[in-house]
Amino acid sequence: MKHSVHFGAGNIGRGFIGEILFKNGFHIDFVDVNNQIIHALNEKGKYEIEIAQKGQSRIEVTNVAGINSKEHPEQVIEAIQKTDIITTAIGPNILPFIAELLAKGIEARRVAGNTQVLDVMACENMIGGSQFLYQEVKKYLSPEGLTFADNYIGFPNAAVDRIVPAQSHEDSLFVVVEPFNEWVVETKRLKNPDLRLKDVHYEEDLEPFIERKLFSVNSGHATSAYIGAHYGAKTILEALQNPNIKSRIESVLAEIRSLLIAKWNFDKKELENYHKVIIERFENPFIVDEVSRVARTPIRKLGYNERFIRPIRELKELSLSYKNLLKTVGYAFDYRDVNDEESIRLGELLAKQLVKDVVIQVTGLDDQELIEQIVEYI
């Protein structure tokens, strides 16, 4: 049986990446620091996924195990030494924390003389995630390890898309996911092109697909949350049931479409259909997706290269409309949740400093005209 190492045994890891790896015949070693999840994986050796749609069918994922990377790093290194593929779903901010362990695993392959080519795919909500991870891993590799990695270890970027809401069940491994999923891998950085996963798309140039996903799904989802929160909605479905909010989300997606078409020459009709499907996904009555989950960490989401500021910058450069995105940015700056550290910090910054200074600090912008435009909406 083929072997995989997956960093991140959370809902997305189990409910999306784990399902695909299982369907492709892999044994999966989930690596995490959550002892409860790791213990359950080792005790049961399987878990169930429920598809959030009419009929609510279930998939049993078997041949799984767990490794606590904090308590047993040597087991992770041993697994990496022998594995056929490595994936992650831990969040962009956590990638640097697994780099040293990954480097040790690569060094172990080198010392063992394992020259079987291996690909490492960071399945995160970020542009260039795998290459970012590689830059972090390189900091811990010896000169010999660097040469070995360049020859035998690939870090192809990936774009992933599936809504997996925050949830809690008596069975800690059980996870509910939406029916839709998309996983796209760039081919130009693959070291093992012969290992093709079914239900995964492969593209020579991944950037258009990553931007289509991030600027459509992530921007649209966050827009639903921030506008929804402003109007008192508790879930994304509740937000979409308000015609005013839905209309605003559609207006944001129309601006995103104009950017994607101008930049990547996407077919207008196909992109309209893609965005229509996104709205339908947000309206899935079988998913309870809390506004608080989607809106959390607003400081990160208002970053220079993130889901709002980047498309706004690029639309401005192309002299295209971004008014609706600006309005959403205003709602994001106004968002407060006592349980979200970043939203509280944002409120404190706005209370202590000039709004303009906070906008510059949070967004990283130096375009004075754009800064002033954002200030008008806060």
Curated annotation (Swiss-Prot):
One BP term from GO: mannitol catabolic process
SUPFAM superfamilies in the record: 6-phosphogluconate dehydrogenase C-terminal domain-like, NAD(P)-binding Rossmann-fold domains
GO molecular function, one term: mannitol-1-phosphate 5-dehydrogenase activity
Top-level taxon of the source organism: Bacteria
Pfam families: Mannitol_dh, Mannitol_dh_C
This enzyme's EC code(s): 1.1.1.17
List of residues binding NAD(+): 4-15
Assigned keywords, A-Z: NAD, Oxidoreductase
GO cellular component: cytosol
EC primary class: oxidoreductase
Catalyzed reaction equations: D-mannitol 1-phosphate + NAD(+) = beta-D-fructose 6-phosphate + NADH + H(+)
NCBIfam families xrefs: PRK02318.1-3, PRK02318.2-5
Family statement drawn from the similarity comment of this UniProt entry: Belongs to the mannitol dehydrogenase family.
The name this protein goes by in its record: Mannitol-1-phosphate 5-dehydrogenase
Species of provenance: Streptococcus pneumoniae serotype 2 (strain D39 / NCTC 7466)
Encoding gene, per UniProt annotation: mtlD
